[in-house]
């Protein structure tokens, strides 16, 4: 029942949401019918939108791999570390199991609490300093915070500060995606371009999960806690975002891009 509340809220918002004025004008003029407006072919035909789509997709890959390939393994880190801690204290497996599960759940919760405040802060930074600077700060701090969390987590109390700090910086970049990606494309390609960046980026990012699995079970199998070095290596994915960033156009205080052909009729 609780899970249905966001869906009901989405229905209310959708019913009250209006189409963008520019898009509505294009629809009323019939311009939409004269273009392949909802195809990837149209998106990649123009070098401007093609470049923006590739840049946006790579930026998304960096953040999503960081989250899926590292951040969402936080419960495993907590279970591994605390299981050893409690075993050293003389607890039985029957006692340890429920206890580490509880702390793993707290880890996911505090990660999301940190994410909430991180996204709010990143939105403010993007509005004040610009999108590229917001991305640079987000990727850099995500790398540092994630590496620190997976290297220095040693006790349950850190679940309430080290993990939310990681969530704050790791998911902050997703707020910048929401602002930046729609600003890269003209009206008739905005949804197509944004969905390409998100969905293709997420599809490619799915490779991060088996990669960290391989690092744990093969490359660092000899390590007493293979999750730690595996996560440290995976943190390099945030460098991808920083490498791509010089090719990303700054959109702060600039009008939304438009393809003049769309309004030529």
For the regions a language model picked out, list residue spans one by one.
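Flexible cytoplasmic inter-helical loops of multi-pass small-molecule transporters
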Residues: 15-39, 254-263
